[in-house]
């Protein structure tokens, strides 16, 4: 079993436990994370669980989390970047949350091109793990239940786009973005729930576009390069889709810091191209 196999097994085991205990953290506040956002108790709890599961694997050199200010040195090997509980504010209303993990063959900060694997856990009506690895030709999906993992199949983005989920209030987004957003929303079904993993799962299943643009409140975008944008871009591009920060693939974004943010768009290539073209005219 190589290091990527051990990471995959550890994530499956930890996700089983997280899935069964989320209700215990539905209404627990916990302060602010290093990005200045409100934490819930589940954020810190999940981060501790995944740290214990991943940081001590032979071949892991560093662990970076959305919930920690600094990278933790673990020895030599791959660098882990994780959002342990994406969409955690959804817990209070009993809506879907997730876990996002990027595995980098480089010291952090690093561009997404340095990744060798991306893992996405969705805690919904049932729990799934979607994984892309450099040593596999397909994006695999696994069903996690009753302490076991069952391979369900593989993802290839549908050729026809049917859904769209674009974040941000109309009054906080640029006119150019609102124009292209309205065009997409006239033709596609709206799917936006406030947890990036859950919203992207809609795009992977049905085809379409997910995005978090520049807004007045988040002038650099809201999602973080290491913990959300690049790992999900790796997954989407491996499944035949495309990613963008508005002008280039998210895998080409070069972050200066661990918690750097970027505008984020993920989905069918023709929609991403159309979005980039519209934004380039401003």
From Swiss-Prot:
Cofactor note: Binds 2 magnesium ions per subunit.
SUPFAM superfamilies: Carbohydrate phosphatase
Domain of life from the UniProt record: Archaea
Family matches, as Pfam families: FBPase (PF00316), FBPase_C (PF18913)
Cofactor entry: Mg(2+)
Disulphide linkage map: none
Annotated substrate binding sites: 86-89, 192, 222
One GO biological process term: fructose 1,6-bisphosphate metabolic process
Record-listed E.C. numbers: 3.1.3.11
Residues binding Mg(2+) 2, per UniProt: 83, 86, 228
GO molecular function: fructose 1,6-bisphosphate 1-phosphatase activity; magnesium ion binding
Catalytic activity field: beta-D-fructose 1,6-bisphosphate + H2O = beta-D-fructose 6-phosphate + phosphate
Localization: Cytoplasm
Keywords of the record: Carbohydrate metabolism, Cytoplasm, Hydrolase, Magnesium, Metal-binding
Residues the entry annotates as binding Mg(2+) 1: 66, 83, 85
Keyword Magnesium: yes
GO cellular component: cytoplasm
Pathway note: Carbohydrate biosynthesis; gluconeogenesis
InterPro entries given in the database record: FBPase_C_dom (IPR044015), FBPase_class-1 (IPR000146), FBPase_N (IPR033391), SBPase (IPR023079)
Family named by the database record: Belongs to the FBPase class 1 family.
Subunit composition and interactions: Homotetramer.
Name by which UniProt lists this protein: Fructose-1,6-bisphosphatase class 1 2
Upper lineage: Archaea, Methanobacteriati, Methanobacteriota, Stenosarchaea group, Halobacteria
């Amino acid at each position: 079993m190589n290091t990527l196999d051990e990471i995959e097994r550890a994530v499956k085991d930890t996700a089983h436990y997280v899935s069964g205990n989320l209700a215990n953290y539905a209404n627990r506040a916990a302060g602010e994370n290093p990005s200045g956002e409100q934490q819930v108790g589940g954020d810190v709890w999940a981060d501790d669980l995944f740290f214990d599961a991943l940081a001590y694997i032979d071949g892991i050199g560093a662990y970076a989390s959305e919930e920690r200010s600094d990278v933790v040195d673990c020895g030599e090997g791959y660098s882990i970047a994780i959002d342990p509980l994406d969409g955690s504010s959804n817990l209070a209303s009993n809506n879907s949350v997730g876990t996002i993990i990027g595995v980098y063959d480089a010291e952090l900060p690093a561009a997404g091109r340095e990744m060798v694997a991306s893992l996405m856990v969705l805690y919904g009506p049932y729990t799934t793990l979607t994984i892309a690895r450099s040593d596999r030709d397909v994006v695999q999906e696994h069903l996690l239940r009753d302490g076991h993992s069952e391979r369900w199949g593989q993802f290839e983005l549908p050729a026809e786009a049917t859904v769209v989920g674009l974040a941000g209030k109309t009054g906080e987004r640029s006119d150019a973005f609102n124009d292209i957003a309205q065009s997409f929303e006239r033709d596609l079904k709206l799917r936006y729930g406030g947890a990036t993993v859950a919203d992207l799962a809609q795009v992977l299943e049905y085809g379409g576009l997910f995005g978090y643009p520049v807004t007045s409140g988040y002038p650099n975008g809201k999602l973080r390069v290491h913990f959300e944008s690049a790992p999900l871009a790796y997954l989407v591009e491996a499944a035949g889709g495309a990613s963008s920060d508005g002008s280039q693939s998210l895998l080409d974004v070069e972050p200066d810091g661990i918690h750097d943010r970027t505008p984020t768009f993920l989905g069918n290539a023709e929609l991403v191209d159309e979005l980039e073209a519209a934004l380039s005219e401003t």
